[in-house]
Amino acid sequence: MNEFNIAAQDFLQRVFNKLDAQNIQLDKHWFIDHLCYRVSSLENYNSFKTRFASFAELLIESDVNGRPIATYKFAEPIRFRDWFIQVVELPAPKPGKVTIEGFEHFEVVADIGFDEIKTRYPKAAFSESGLKKDFNPELEISLGELAIKFHPLSLESVIRLEKNEAVYAAVKGSGVLKSLKEHQPLLVGTFPLGINVSGSDVDVLINVPDLTAAETLFKKHFSGFENFKTEAHAQYSAVTASFDFQGVPFEVFAQVKDSAKQSGNLHFLAEERLLHVGGASLGEKILALRKAGDKTEPAFAKALGLSGNPYDELLRLQKLSESELRQLLR
């Protein structure tokens, strides 16, 4: 692990040197959720799997377009500046492609959308091919042989969804993300966090030009699904659509507001990082409170001993760096 940690530190320093040279600053409360380590052959892929098994937990190994990709979580995080990175993705090389062995990129979950990222870094060399994906699209900043990528869901949250086969199949099969793609759909809520209970629904946030358009949009795409209904929420300036697909309940929440800036997403981002910092013990506490009837944000507030309005407290925590969150959870 020590040799791997040294290599990771060197990689991260090289990336940040390139970012600094382009005046690209990452906010300290953004989540560097994983690193990607590429290998040059299938033989080396299997060799690294054996090495990783001695100091990391295998979260999942999947076949992606004909090649295996393994994801590991380290018991001890790789610390760099204010970030503590625990997850590493290990893809086997694509057949016929020459791959340089070593760390290649890291991925970031930010609290701003792709358009704002492009506006913030106007001189960056963006690759937008990953934006075509309906599920967890990504925007890349190319840095020569290295890169960073932005995506709305951390890799660990994606893996939690993939392991919940019925829910993952419903998300894919319903086409909800594809049909709402031009409205910045964000998948949030308890399923990606692994704290879902009986009755939990799949939560999706979208941005619409006006609320009347939202109702029209919902009827167009979802009126044929079971238990479809829409509801206006004046207190939130929002409209929701709820429906069932393959026995899985969905709720789509629409506001005239950038999806990334909506409170539902900011709460989700805070909770995702708190579970990253607090680990399995915090997750178990939250799940027990949820099963006892607490809603998600009050459950976090109770587990963390937060005073005041739980929703406001989580918005406050969302802006803290990981170092500050770790201090809070001591």
Give names to the regions the model predicted.
Residues 70-78, 224-258:
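Conserved catalytic core of two-metal-ion nucleotidyltransferases
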Residues 2-19, 55-97, 131-159, 248-254:
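Conserved short beta-strand elements that form part of the metal-binding/catalytic scaffold
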Residues 47-56, 117-123, 214-223:
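Short amphipathic alpha-helices in soluble, non-transmembrane regions
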Residues 117-162, 286-299, 305-330:
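Glycine-rich, aromatic-bearing surface loops/beta-hairpins
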Residues 22-57, 194-202, 207-208:
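N-terminal interaction modules that seed assembly of large macromolecular complexes
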Residues 31-40, 94-116, 204-205:
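Vicinal oxygen chelate
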Residues 175-212:
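Active-site nucleotide-donor binding segment shared across nucleotidyl transfer reactions
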